[in-house]
Structures are given as structure tokens and as C-alpha cells.
Amino acid sequence: GVRQQFSIRENIEIGLYGVDFVKNASQYLSVDNETVDLGWRELGYLFLASAEGQRILSENQQLQSQCGAKIEILNPENLKIKFPWLNIDGIALGSFGYEGEGWLDPSLFLNAFRAKARALGATFLHGEVTEIVKYKQKISSVILDSGVQVGCSFLVNAAGAWAGAVAELAKIRLPVVPKKRIIYGLDCREKLNPKLPLVIDASGVFIRSEGTGFVCGVSPPAHLDPNSWDDMEVDYSLFDEIIWPAIAHRIPAFEAVKVTNAWAGWYDYNTLDQNGVIGPHGEIDNFFFANGFSGHGLQQSPAIGRAIMELITFGEYRTIDLSRFSHERIIRGLALTERNVV
């Protein structure tokens, strides 16, 4: 999904550019003047807060509005008017992105990027990087598992969940690990509004519409969330014990649901603060980070790609200053904590 409901100004600005990019995808990604369809559904994000979390939610909304995001605060009465299917028990406040928030088809997004890159002359090589070769204070080449050596003027680490392992090849510490996340597809017996926004309950459980059904998930508690290098098994107990009780309480129509499908994938999880690590390495001149987005990678990729381009081309940020996301904070152990993580 794409949203602006963050607590850090840079993340909000990244989200604003992200939605502009998605809504104008044909302008940015078209090849041979073909229309680019990303399956964009602009149905909004609805964050719900208990009494304990309402101050933070309100403060976040003020910052989001200052940045130009279209986010409205709703008290329980207005929540019930706008979303009559919602149980407001235990909810003190909600914030709703009424414009510029929604979701898209990630495979269409990836394929559109790939097609545009190829049209502009990019070459894709398939393989695993097994060695990074340095000469003085620069990366000179990488070696693939096939034995092929690829020279480089710049190396951008955009290895997703395996970014930490790639950085280690250059003897760089990067606290990014794979964390398994599971999405469950649902069919609801009771007829419910097919344009359900992405609802984030105060419990952390989220659910949204998907086609004629719904999808839901949650970031599991720490003791159920180990680093996951090769485990892609779907844990149905997570749905039964945590997700279903929460969504059935918040949206009573979900008391009678059937799990129709489920799948697992990886977050590139930054263990320091769940925020991106962006920009050059302080000592290796041509090594750049685009890592650790902890589930926000798709929506943040347009702005991050532009930022890395600016650094390589101009030696500085020209649009959004992302200096606070530098690798220096990792070295110093200074967390830049985002309060709106899904």
C-alpha cells in the first residue's frame, strides 16, 4: 500500500511523492506510449487509537497535514457515521487518509519498473553476489555465484531482506534481517462494503478489501518473530489466536469468515528502528544503501530511487533531504523511531 500516515516528516514526504508516482505511472513508466495500469485502489488507510494512543495519533495528523497530506481526524461518533460497520468500543480516535492513500498490485509495479529500465538500456543479470572486491576506498567489482565478475563505478545495495548479508561481504555492519510476514485471504459470510479501507486496529491487526474478498495480517509479538531465512510456512494459529479475535471484535461482520488462501513473504527488517538506511557509506566512496524499509519498500521505492540518483548524479539530495536516514546513525546506534508502523 501507499500512505502518508507516518510520524517522521521525511517518511510523509516520501509517501506524498510515492502516491504522485503511482497515480501518474504512465507518465513515469510508459514504454512506447502504452498506458501503465498498476491496479491502484485509492480507498484510504484508517488508523484507530485507544485512549492511550490518541495523543500520538493526533500529533501525527497535525504533522501530516502540515506536509500537505489529506488526513482527517475522526472522533468515535464521526467514525460510526462514516464507517457504520465499525465497532468503536475502546476506540478514542481515528485518522483517515481520504485522498492519496490506497494500494496497488506489486507484481504490476515491479514489471512496469523492469520494462521501463530495459527500455532505457538497463541490463539484468541473474545470480547471487558471493564476493565484493574493493580497491582502496572503492568497490571495484562484484563476483557472482556463476563466477562472472562485474565491474562497477557505483554499487547500490538494494538486496531487500538479504541486504545485511550483502553488506557483510564488504565488511559493513547493517542490521537488516528477513522477518516473515503472513497475509491471509478471507471470505466474509455477511455482505460487507467491498470498498473497505485498510483498517489498522489499535491492536496492530490490519484488514482491507481485496477484489471480492479481504486480506488481513499483523506483525507478530517479538517472541513469535524470529529472523526467518528460509521458513515460508504459513502459521494459521496466528490468525486463529490473534487476528480473528481482533477483526471480529472491531468489525462484527467478520465473526463468520473463512480463510480462502494465505501466503508468506519477507520484510527487510531494520532491527535498530524499522526505518530505511539510505545514502553513501561514510568510508567506501561508491557504496550506497537503499535498505531496511521494514515493509514500506514498495511505497517508498520511487522516492528512494530518485534520492539515490540525486546522490550519484549530483553528490547531494535535490528534492527530499534524507540525511537523517544515513548509515552513520547505524554506526552510532541512534534510532530514528517511526511511530506509525504496520
Go through each PLM region and give its residues:
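Dinucleotide-binding Rossmann-like beta1-alpha1 core, especially the glycine-rich loop
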Residues: G1-K82, G204-F206
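Short beta-strand to alpha-helix junction loop
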Residues: E13-I14, F47-I56, F96-K116, D231-F239
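A short coil-to-beta-strand element that immediately follows conserved catalytic motifs
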Residues: W40-E42, F124-L125, P175-R181, P252-A264, ...
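Helical element adjacent to the flavin cofactor pocket in flavoenzyme catalytic cores
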Residues: F96-F154
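Glycine-rich "substrate-gating" loop/helix at the edge of Rossmann-like oxidoreductase active sites
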Residues: G97-W103, S203, F293-L298
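C-terminal catalytic lobe of FAD-dependent flavoproteins
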Residues: P106, P245-V342
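Central helical "cap/lid" subdomain
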Residues: S146-L196
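Active-site lid/adjacent beta-loop-alpha segment flanking the redox-cofactor pocket in flavoenzymes
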Residues: R173, D187-N286
